[in-house]
Amino acid sequence: MRVVLQRVKEASVTIEGQVVGQIGQGYLLLVGFGPDDTEETLDYMVHKITNLRVFESEPGKMNLGLKDVDGAILSVSQFTLYADVKHGNRPGFSNAAKPSLAEPLYQRFNEKLAATGIPVATGQFGADMQVALVNDGPVTIWYEK
């Protein structure tokens, strides 16, 4: 599982001209799954993400977490995080989990995030989405398990 986390002032995801998910301050998560990901992988990622402290408690001190600032999460599935670009000029995606595995993992991941009490908005698995965001910092964290 790979997650790119971006601290944002706001973010939204649009499908066919309709906003389907949006948040104010919080995290935009770009989420990809590999073929060996399990419930244990989800639990690890949820713990790491929901306990991350990257909001300032005072100038220059990142000591507050998402709950401390009443933040939210926008979770967007993105299989292209598993792109293989070692050969040629066109990426390959054979390292990504098949949709039949990735979609239920994505749904469970979002359920587990929401179960922590943090508001969670989502995109739509497999859809062509337009993601808009206002980076805060910028702060970008890469998770992989």
From Swiss-Prot:
Enzyme Commission number(s) from the entry: 3.1.1.96
Enzyme class: hydrolase
Subcellular location: Cytoplasm
Catalytic activity, reaction form: glycyl-tRNA(Ala) + H2O = tRNA(Ala) + glycine + H(+); a D-aminoacyl-tRNA + H2O = a tRNA + a D-alpha-amino acid + H(+)
Disulfide-bonded cysteines: none
Primary site of residence: cytoplasm
Taxonomic superkingdom: Bacteria
UniProt keyword RNA-binding present: yes
GO terms assigned for molecular function: D-tyrosyl-tRNA(Tyr) deacylase activity; Gly-tRNA(Ala) deacylase activity; Ser(Gly)-tRNA(Ala) hydrolase activity; tRNA binding
GO cellular component: cytoplasm
InterPro entries: Daa-tRNA_deacyls_DTD, DTD-like_sf
Entry comment, domain topic: A Gly-cisPro motif from one monomer fits into the active site of the other monomer to allow specific chiral rejection of L-amino acids.
Family: Belongs to the DTD family.
Subunit-structure text: Homodimer.
Name of the protein in its database record: D-aminoacyl-tRNA deacylase
